[in-house]
């Protein structure tokens, strides 16, 4: 009931639909578009790609975005460079069920406007989580390159939820993310940037909310509202937490 209420009153609400930017060829899916009032813009031509600001309490700032298209790889890296992004969380595979879900944006051959260099070999943080480190700069004379770490979670299928055993993997991922992110926004993407991405951001926020309450209050009762949290996410990026299964997984 909660999920259906949120879906009808936010995702398909006329007022919210009117907030969406018009469709263009930069969108992977025509029905998943950012809201006009919190779209992430990049410096060149005040251009936007399919990315939304997600601001949550306690300085938890995210950019929720789609998996880059071949035609938006440079825009994606310009966004990361402009906003000094330190961590990218990738929640999809390049292909799933024989369908392309995301361009291989970390292949330096696909990057034209920036110089992208992988700093060291990728490694497995834990089973199902690959870690890659990159350095990105505008040109050879750029003496202040941005270093970015990509956390690639590979065991979460589209429109689904991870198995229960994956909770420990997610917590490990949260801890690793916290170590690297500093005060910069964290880029989170899957394919559309709403289902898995919204669920991940909700879980990250709840995890820290619970830890903070335990530390600050030393109380036996933990208070939070999943419905309110998902409502906030949907108001910042349409269709965040895309289906009922993902909503239940948060619980």
List each model region and its residues.
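Cys-based phosphatases of the PTP/DUSP/CDC25 superfamily and their flanking regulatory architecture
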Residues: 1-251
